[in-house]
Amino acid sequence: MSNCRRLLCRQLSSAYLNYLPFYFLIYRPFSLYLSSCEYWQSCFSFFFLFFLFFFFFFTFQFLVAFPILLFKVSLNSTLTKHVRPIHQRTKARSLTHHCIPKRWNIHFFFSGLLHKTISRIFSWIGNTRQVAPTKHTPKYLLNTI
């Protein structure tokens, strides 16, 4: 297995291990609870589960994943300080651009998903709002409003 593939496997497995507490603490017990009784049809239980999921999701994100991310970023910056600039590297070392750099950590993908979806929703709401043109509105924007 090449170094690139090993690095990718390690990042994927650590990202997967970060989300294992969700499965055992939230999803598994409540799926068993819902499959064992008829309360899943009521609105109360649905909103209760919804609240619980988001509560645990945010607490996990900010108490566990975010400090890990900060530590990894600081560790990466201290580890990569000794690396020579690209123009000073040899041909053999320049082949490492096929690997995923350590700075593009797979954790950024998972932790950024929630923020990305929320910001997209808000930008969609902002873009669909009707805005009346003023006298300062440029002419090229008048037919877009």
UniProtKB/Swiss-Prot annotation:
Topology class, membrane: Single-pass membrane protein
Keywords on record: Membrane, Transmembrane, Transmembrane helix
Annotated transmembrane regions: 46-66
GO cellular component, one term: membrane
Location (main, coarse): membrane
Subcellular location(s) of the protein: Membrane
Name the UniProt record assigns to this protein: Putative uncharacterized protein YNL179C
Organism, scientific name: Saccharomyces cerevisiae (strain ATCC 204508 / S288c) (Baker's yeast)
